[in-house]
Amino acid sequence: MTNIRKTHPLMKIINNSFIDLPTPSNISSWWNFGSLLGICLIIQILTGLFLAMHYTSDTLTAFSSVTHICRDVNYGWLIRYLHANGASMFFICLFLHVGRGLYYGSYLFLETWNIGVLLLFAVMATAFMGYVLPWGQMSFWGATVITNLLSAIPYIGSDLVQWIWGGFSVDKATLTRFFAFHFILPFIVAALAGVHLLFLHETGSNNPSGLSSDADKIPFHPYYTIKDILGALMLILILMMLVLFSPDLLGDPDNYTPANPLNTPPHIKPEWYFLFAYAILRSIPNKLGGVLALVLSILVLAFMPLLHTSKQRSMMFRPLSQCLFWILVADLIILTWIGGQPVEHPFIIIGQLASILYFMLILILMPLVSLFENNLMKW
């Protein structure tokens, strides 16, 4: 009798992706984040669905509907904080996943990498629109400031902004369309993640050494299923600790004040996971220049395969490149800190220096050091 797992059209896809998939025997815990991102996405879609059942996307009732969810709906507070902090966990996993890709040269899988960059943009767009929905002060002013950046586009800018707003300011039309997009985008993200996986399974996984692992593959199940379950339990533990002990740790207190177009908060800032990009945006005194730098801060990832000058794929055996990589990580942490600070001395100059260093490291220093390491190998 033939095994249904290997013959049934649907089961066959699952089998070849999660059960009999030949996997390198030496992939470390850094390879856990793909599955963790999948779990995060499922958590976000499920909690979001239940929140949408009680939420109203109207400027007059949005804020009070969120309050109603927290106070009157059974376990509404849990669903709301799982969704809010789930987004933070999502981005932590995303940053670590991208960092792993940069460190081990996974970006040389071109299709997988490019869809990954597209996924990053899609998730960032989803998170931004989700932050607008509670209609607190930071929701309203964050939406106003970020959408206004599009007015820097020459000629069509101001028309484009009004088209997105659906009027002359962020209002009911804006909130309604943001809710609609926030609902549909995660499903697009899920579809893209499927394509991401499809392309990955065309080539097989990379591994820490960056060398071919064809000679030493093991089945995904049970070895990596059990490893992924351990990762998932750790993720859920951290998420539940956040949700149950300090649910507002990563939020902004200003968002507990209903949106008021007549009163601007002293410091407008996005959620913590956008602060590094926000710091880069603010470090350039010109509006259009700032917007370009903001987009490039993420889009620069798409150029990584072109900037790869080393003869080795991974950084595992390249100590100089490792040094620069960890300087880049430290630089991103500094940018995140600066993004949350007021625009005054010394934060302005620190932000500008950190922004310059960010682009210099990726575009100039790392490719040059890789070439230098190639020459060192000849000795």
Swiss-Prot record:
Entry keyword set: Electron transport, Heme, Iron, Membrane, Metal-binding, Mitochondrion, Mitochondrion inner membrane, Respiratory chain, Transmembrane, Transmembrane helix, Transport, Ubiquinone
Binding site for a ubiquinone: 201
Cofactor note: Binds 2 heme b groups non-covalently.
Membrane association type: Multi-pass membrane protein
Binding site for heme b b566: 97, 196
Mutation effect (residue 92 to M): In strain: Isolate SO-2000/12/28-1
Segments crossing the lipid bilayer: 33-53, 77-98, 113-133, 178-198, 226-246, 288-308, 320-340, 347-367
InterPro entries: Cyt_b/b6_C, Cyt_b/b6_C_sf, Cyt_b/b6_N, Cytb/b6-like_sf, Cytochrome_b, Cytochrome_b_C_euk/bac, Cytochrome_b_N_euk/bac, Di-haem_cyt_TM
Superkingdom of origin organism: Eukaryota
Reported impact of residue 334 to T: In strain: Isolate SO-2000/12/28-1
Signal peptide: none
Keyword Nucleotide-binding: no
Positions bound to heme b b562: 83, 182
GO CC, any one term: mitochondrial inner membrane
Molecular functions per Gene Ontology: metal ion binding; ubiquinol-cytochrome-c reductase activity
Cofactor entry: heme b
Quaternary structure (record): The cytochrome bc1 complex contains 11 subunits: 3 respiratory subunits (MT-CYB, CYC1 and UQCRFS1), 2 core proteins (UQCRC1 and UQCRC2) and 6 low-molecular weight proteins (UQCRH/QCR6, UQCRB/QCR7, UQCRQ/QCR8, UQCR10/QCR9, UQCR11/QCR10 and a cleavage product of UQCRFS1). This cytochrome bc1 complex then forms a dimer.
Family: Belongs to the cytochrome b family.
Miscellaneous information on this protein: Heme 1 (or BL or b562) is low-potential and absorbs at about 562 nm, and heme 2 (or BH or b566) is high-potential and absorbs at about 566 nm.
Biological role stated in the UniProt entry: Component of the ubiquinol-cytochrome c reductase complex (complex III or cytochrome b-c1 complex) that is part of the mitochondrial respiratory chain. The b-c1 complex mediates electron transfer from ubiquinol to cytochrome c. Contributes to the generation of a proton gradient across the mitochondrial membrane that is then used for ATP synthesis.
Protein name, entry field: Cytochrome b
Species name: Anourosorex yamashinai
